[in-house]
A protein has these predicted regions:
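Strand-loop microenvironment adjacent to phosphate/nucleotide-handling motifs in alpha/beta enzyme folds
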Residues: 2-140
């Protein structure tokens, strides 16, 4: 990813411009700077050095983020390289991961994830609503 759309969209909204959505079906994970710090600290304190942790994050629809920001939206066509959904763990990687402390971890023993499991923003079981996004936007 090249980063968050938040600063770009906030700038456009402040200028009275519309934001462009290239894929109305697009979803993303909501990952705050504080969440990133918590993940790094947990990993350093609680995991052996050869492990990798992936956070369990809520997803949101990009159209609902625009709605939460009260943005005027222009729809464009999908561009080369655009992904509809973010994928944190592919189905072929998931055999190496387990669930631990509300995260996905590679490199420790434990209960395996179901065969073919994929951790994607489009198939996630945690979703932020427009109201949730409005609350989250107040703190970032």
């Amino acid at each position: 990813s090249r980063g968050s759309v938040l600063p770009v969209w906030r700038d456009k909204i402040a200028k009275g411009e519309s934001v462009t959505i290239h894929d109305a079906e697009a979803t993303r994970f909501w990952f705050t700077p504080g969440g990133a710090v918590d993940l790094v600290l947990w990993t350093l304190q609680d995991l052996p050095g050869n492990c990798m942790a992936v956070p369990s994050l809520p997803s949101f629809k990009i159209t609902e983020l625009a709605q939460a920001m009260n943005a005027s939206v222009t729809y464009g066509s999908k561009r080369p390289g655009d992904k509809t959904h973010e994928s944190m763990i592919s189905s072929h990687e998931s055999q190496d991961f387990v669930r631990a402390d509300g995260r996905y971890v590679r490199g420790i023993n434990g209960g395996a994830l179901p065969p073919g499991f994929e951790y994607s923003s489009g198939t996630n079981d945690q979703w932020l609503t427009v109201d949730d996004l409005k609350r989250e936007l107040e703190s970032v």
